[in-house]
Design a protein with these regions (language model features):
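Conserved class I S-adenosyl-L-methionine
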Residues: 108-118
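Conserved beta-strand signature within the Rossmann-like core of class I S-adenosyl-L-methionine
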Residues: 208-218
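A short acidic, Gly/Pro-enriched loop at the edge of an enzyme's catalytic core
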Residues: 169-180
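N-terminal accessory regions of S-adenosyl-L-methionine
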Residues: 1-90, 266-270
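A short glycine-rich, Lys/Arg-flanked "PGG" loop and its adjoining helix->strand segment in the class I
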Residues: 194-208
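Conserved SAM-binding loop of SAM-dependent methyltransferases across substrates and taxa
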Residues: 119-131
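Conserved alpha-helix/loop element of class I SAM-dependent methyltransferases that forms part
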Residues: 90-109
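Class I S-adenosyl-L-methionine
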Residues: 220-270
Length: 270
């Protein structure tokens, strides 16, 4: 699990990089000149300017401009923010959604895979629960948007994302995953051969007893894909505790559990 200090360092790094990326070339050059002058003033001209010294000075200038908090101040605020981030409703998810229902089964350090931009909210929620999160998206824009939001929310500690032609390429995973969240809308857009290939890879990458949560999104119905799990067990999703008058019930999604392999029988020699 990533320590608070590492999370803080990642937060500062990402804020600084985002600031640099927002500057035009002439502004970057002026920033470099400011850094060189600051180094010269601080050392009364007796210095050996290296790339490392320049980079550190530039980062310090940006940190002051952005008024980034100290680690102590950030940690105090971060604890309150992280508590809010762990709530499904913080990300616009219903408390009875399939992903919310599976949260009690997860532990920090578990591995999860999220597929499709329509499952964006689930990605943030899982990252807030300190799982090792891998995301697969079909386009650069979605990936960039989610990476940027992850960084802004200080959720990048155990997060990585890939852009791929879904169903044609699959990342090499160090270990199988405990949870896969799939955007039904993304599945609906794939040609059948690629959809079947993607689902086969996702199922193979899941530990026995692991869970797939198929979430409605982008006009795709989760129920439409239950047939892709012929040997898996369907897990009931808790019903909504209260109903809103006049409001149409939204689908919570579908939960499927990978079966355990049959126990190997050993002949008795007694």
């Amino acid at each position: 699990v990533v320590s608070p200090k590492q999370q803080y360092q990642e937060y500062v790094f990402q804020r600084i990089e985002d600031y640099k990326n927002s500057l035009a070339r002439d502004e970057l050059l002026r920033l470099g000149n400011d850094a060189a002058l600051e180094i010269q003033d601080a050392t009364e001209g007796q210095y050996f300017l290296t790339e490392v010294v320049m980079q550190e000075t530039v980062d310090d200038i940006i940190r002051k401009r952005l008024r980034l908090p100290s680690f102590k101040r950030w940690r105090e605020k971060h604890a309150k923010v992280r508590q809010a981030q762990k709530s499904p409703t913080h990300w616009g998810l219903e408390r009875n959604s399939a992903v919310a229902a599976i949260l009690p089964r997860l532990e920090a350090g578990d591995r999860a895979l999220v597929v499709g931009g329509g499952a964006e909210a689930a990605a943030y929620l899982l990252a807030a629960h300190d799982v090792h999160l891998t995301c697969l998206f079909g386009d650069d824009r979605t990936c960039t948007r989610i990476e940027t939001r992850m960084a802004a929310e200080s959720l990048t500690g155990n997060f990585e994302a890939f852009v791929a032609m879904l169903g044609s390429w699959f990342p090499s995973l160090d270990q199988p995953v405990h949870l896969v969240v799939i955007d039904a809308g993304t599945l609906a857009t794939l040609p059948s051969p690629r959809r079947v290939s993607l689902m086969a890879r996702l199922q193979d990458a899941t530990v026995p007893g692991g869970i797939h949560a198929v979430m409605p999104g982008g006009g795709g119905a989760a129920e439409a894909w239950v047939s892709l799990y012929p040997d898996w067990e369907r897990i009931p999703v808790p019903a909504r505790s209260t109903r809103t008058r006049g409001k149409r019930e939204s689908s919570p999604g579908v939960l499927m559990s990978r079966p355990f392999p049959p126990a190997t029988s050993h002949a008795s020699t007694a």
